[in-house]
Structure formats: structure tokens, C-alpha cells
């Protein structure tokens, strides 16, 4: 860079630094019109803004789900134990512990289809189960 360019840039920076927020906003609009562009926020900033908007923005659907075992009738415990062992791969002792002191999360970070299938199997065995997005 030449000395003239550097000096003119420094002068420009000083001038811009002295502008008020309203003047900067007006400058932004003028530049958008002159150059036929828009000042779009980066994707991450837009996502953060949408998360902060709460009820205004539609929530994105979860991709990971947790299956919760809520209730097991005493007469259905053996059937539910078999399903818990099948879907979790746990040994008998751990599966038995899983069915006591409910509610307990049986499966975490699983796909929606897998969560639905797991809940269906548990309900068919007589348990009360549900899933929710993480």
C-alpha cells in the first residue's frame, strides 16, 4: 500500500468511527442501494437469533430422541424385562434394575424411527413408555 492510500483509509476509519448508530444505519441502507446488495447476517447469527425468538419461530424438529420407561404393571414385568434387554442389550440384572424406580431413560440419542419402535415394543409388552426430542 502506498502512503496516500494508507492515510486515506485511516481518515475513512476515523470518520466512520465518529458516526452515531443512526448514521451508521443510514449508511448501511445507502450502501445496500448503491451496490444492490443486502447486509445478510451469517448463518450462525441467524440461528442464534431464531433460537432467541422463542414462540415466534417454529422449533426445528429434533434428530435425537430419548425413550423413557414410565410404568410397568407387576403382572407385565417379565415381558417388559425381555423387551428392555432386547432394545438395550443389557444383562438380566441391569434390565431388572432399569424397570425399578421408574421413570427411567431406556434409550438415549436414538433416531425418531428407532424411538417410536422401542416405545411400541414396550407398550405391546404392557409398559407405559414415551419418547421426546433431545
Curated annotation (Swiss-Prot):
GO terms for molecular function: mRNA binding; structural constituent of ribosome. The keyword Ribonucleoprotein applies. Gene3D superfamilies: 3.30.1390.10, Single helix bin. It holds the Pfam family Ribosomal_L12. GO terms for biological process: translation. InterPro entries: Ribosomal_bL12 (IPR000206), Ribosomal_bL12_C (IPR013823), Ribosomal_bL12_C/ClpS-like (IPR014719), Ribosomal_bL12_oligo (IPR008932), Ribosomal_bL12_oligo_N_sf (IPR036235). GO terms for cellular component: cytosolic large ribosomal subunit. Keywords: Ribonucleoprotein, Ribosomal protein. Forms part of the ribosomal stalk which helps the ribosome interact with GTP-bound translation factors. Is thus essential for accurate translation. Belongs to the bacterial ribosomal protein bL12 family. Homodimer. Part of the ribosomal stalk of the 50S ribosomal subunit. Forms a multimeric L10(L12)X complex, where L10 forms an elongated spine to which 2 to 4 L12 dimers bind in a sequential fashion. Binds GTP-bound translation factors. NCBIfam families: L12 (TIGR00855). This is Large ribosomal subunit protein bL12.
Amino acid at each position: 500500500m502506498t502512503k496516500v492510500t494508507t492515510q486515506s483509509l485511516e481518515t475513512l476509519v476515523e470518520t466512520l468511527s465518529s458516526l452515531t448508530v443512526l448514521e451508521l444505519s443510514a449508511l448501511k441502507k445507502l450502501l445496500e442501494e448503491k451496490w444492490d446488495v443486502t447486509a445478510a447476517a451469517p448463518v450462525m447469527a441467524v440461528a442464534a437469533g431464531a433460537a432467541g425468538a422463542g414462540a415466534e419461530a417454529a422449533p426445528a424438529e429434533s434428530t435425537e430422541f430419548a425413550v423413557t420407561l414410565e410404568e410397568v404393571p407387576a403382572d407385565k414385568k417379565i415381558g417388559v424385562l425381555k423387551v428392555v434387554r432386547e432394545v438395550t442389550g443389557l444383562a438380566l440384572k441391569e434390565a431388572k434394575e432399569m424397570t425399578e424406580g421408574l421413570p427411567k431413560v431406556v434409550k438415549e440419542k436414538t433416531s425418531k424411527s428407532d424411538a417410536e419402535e422401542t416405545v411400541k415394543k414396550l407398550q405391546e409388552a404392557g409398559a407405559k413408555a414415551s419418547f421426546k426430542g433431545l
